[in-house]
Amino acid sequence: MHLPSLSLAWALAGSSLALPQAEQPVLQDDRASSRAAAVKEAFSHAWDGYKKYAFPHDELHPISNGYGNSRNGWGASAVDALSTAIVMRNATIVHEILDHIATIDYSKTSDTVSLFETTIRYLGGMLSGYDLLKGPAADLVKDTSKVDILLKQSKNLGDILKFAFDTPSGVPYNNINITSHGHDGAKTNGLAVTGTLVLEWTRLSDLTGDPEYAQLSQKAESYLLHPQPSSAEPFPGLIGSNIDIKTGQFTDGHVSWNGGDDSYYEYLIKMYVYDPTRFALYRDRWVAAAESSIEHLASHPASRPDLTFLATYDGGRYGLSSQHLACFDGGNFLLGGTVLDRRDLIDFGLALVDACHETYSQTLTGIGPESFGWDANSVPADQKELYERAGFYVQNGAYILRPEVIESFYYAWRVTGRSEYRDWVWTAFVAINKTCRTGSGYAGLTNVNAENGGGRYDNQESFLFAEVLKYAYLTHSEELMAAEDAWQVQRGDGNQFVFNTEAHPIRVHHS
């Protein structure tokens, strides 16, 4: 999950049925190898450009060959790239990143720090690197002291950030000043921002033996698991979007799986995967939310009733619009469905995946838009043909290298074994590589439904490394060794790792 704002501070450059027990189709051949190699090449291309023009800053500006520091100036792209470099077994890049992480002083930044973004990118990236390099990828780094620094730096970062939870309720401030221990004076915090800390902070406690980090994040989460007042939960498991920092009470009952709400639901089932013993309540709340979503939020465009999207709900009114960010939902249903052995949830997840696939396959670039709608009464005049054909119209045509659609394709491939989903990942990757690639990296697009994507955004988000290229690679990697399979999503309840919302694999507690 990433917050949906597109108030970008960058320059514009230029204008089915599930088959849970199916055999994995054989793509262990030259085609699979060449696809995996192509994704690795894209990763190396983006890394080389970042290293040459932007390192150790946060992100590359891939058109002007400049750099940005939107994530505190600690080298977000490097930390976000670590777990992908590990699963690609690129020892050279892994060592470059480890050497950089050892030098970061997390106590120093002139920026306002986002507790949420810093947790999912930096803390998640380092904890994942530690879990992978202490486990199935231990052979990549012989000097274990370099790996140990990852946990030391994770603890340092947790200690620097934890004052954010020092509020009357324990619901944290998100936008904080780590030098003054101040904050932005916000009265509320968002559902996803509050509810997408618990995996990383619990893992930090489990690895260090210090329970404080888990206690802080789980105290904040407790208000989400037991929402008050009752109007905050219009349907079982589906809850409002904003929480009063002083009281822990919800201030609304607006329900969605869109950005700002999304990864709260994502982490409910993932916490159960992480540790079924401690987090059974999280599972129950996720099941309630999933079942309520099927009953109350499932929506079918009038022009394409075969498609299924999730609507929003607020005070008796439904909103028929969604986002690229929300397209993680199919993968989340698939994960929950396979872990809980619920065929109905798997089938619904596949329906969501199919609909989000349409948002890619029906545009001129083959890439999906930032946001889209399917309200038959609100179709723009110049998009009526698109709506009739595809079942949606574009509300915001930007693409900023988001991963969620490819992410759900990956889950569909892992859960069903059906090769069409693998092919969908490849087709999406080819479209991104064709349309977004620059001489030094990858740029965002202003309009996915315009020739060549319209204009370009001069920014390469760190989640290109962490998510897009990781999911594309894992879908096509040949799992020749049991160790290499360990970090993959598994059918059933045999997962050894669970991905945080930035696609960093975190080792589950009981393995």
UniProtKB/Swiss-Prot annotation:
Q: How is the cofactor bound?
A: Ca(2+). Can also use Mg(2+), but with lower efficiency.
Report one GO cellular component: cytoplasmic vesicle lumen
Q: Which reaction does it catalyse?
A: N(4)-(alpha-D-Man-(1->2)-alpha-D-Man-(1->2)-alpha-D-Man-(1->3)-[alpha-D-Man-(1->2)-alpha-D-Man-(1->3)-[alpha-D-Man-(1->2)-alpha-D-Man-(1->6)]-alpha-D-Man-(1->6)]-beta-D-Man-(1->4)-beta-D-GlcNAc-(1->4)-beta-D-GlcNAc)-L-asparaginyl-[protein] (N-glucan mannose isomer 9A1,2,3B1,2,3) + 4 H2O = N(4)-(alpha-D-Man-(1->3)-[alpha-D-Man-(1->3)-[alpha-D-Man-(1->6)]-alpha-D-Man-(1->6)]-beta-D-Man-(1->4)-beta-D-GlcNAc-(1->4)-beta-D-GlcNAc)-L-asparaginyl-[protein] (N-glucan mannose isomer 5A1,2) + 4 beta-D-mannose; N(4)-(alpha-D-Man-(1->2)-alpha-D-Man-(1->2)-alpha-D-Man-(1->3)-[alpha-D-Man-(1->3)-[alpha-D-Man-(1->2)-alpha-D-Man-(1->6)]-alpha-D-Man-(1->6)]-beta-D-Man-(1->4)-beta-D-GlcNAc-(1->4)-beta-D-GlcNAc)-L-asparaginyl-[protein] (N-glucan mannose isomer 8A1,2,3B1,3) + 3 H2O = N(4)-(alpha-D-Man-(1->3)-[alpha-D-Man-(1->3)-[alpha-D-Man-(1->6)]-alpha-D-Man-(1->6)]-beta-D-Man-(1->4)-beta-D-GlcNAc-(1->4)-beta-D-GlcNAc)-L-asparaginyl-[protein] (N-glucan mannose isomer 5A1,2) + 3 beta-D-mannose
Task: Name the cofactor(s) required for activity, per the record.
Answer: Ca(2+); Mg(2+)
Q: State the name under which the record lists this protein.
A: Probable mannosyl-oligosaccharide alpha-1,2-mannosidase 1B
Q: Which residues are glycosylated?
A: 90, 177, 433
Pfam family membership, one: Glyco_hydro_47
State the function annotated in the UniProt record: Involved in the maturation of Asn-linked oligosaccharides. Progressively trims alpha-1,2-linked mannose residues from Man(9)GlcNAc(2) to produce Man(5)GlcNAc(2).
- Annotated GO biological process: carbohydrate metabolic process; ERAD pathway; protein glycosylation
Q: How does it assemble?
A: Monomer.
Uppermost EC category = hydrolase
What keywords are assigned to this protein? Carbohydrate metabolism, Cytoplasmic vesicle, Disulfide bond, Glycoprotein, Glycosidase, Hydrolase, Metal-binding, Signal
Q: What is its EC number?
A: 3.2.1.113
- Kindly list the GO molecular function terms attached to this UniProt entry: calcium ion binding; mannosyl-oligosaccharide 1,2-alpha-mannosidase activity
Q: Could you say which protein family the record assigns here?
A: Belongs to the glycosyl hydrolase 47 family.
Where are the active-site residues found? 370 (proton donor)
Q: Which cysteines are joined by disulfide bonds?
A: 327-356
According to its UniProt record, where is this protein mainly located? cytoplasm
Q: Where does Ca(2+) bind?
A: 501
In which compartments does the protein localize?
Cytoplasmic vesicle lumen
Signal sequence segment = 1-18
Q: In which pathway does it act?
A: Protein modification; protein glycosylation
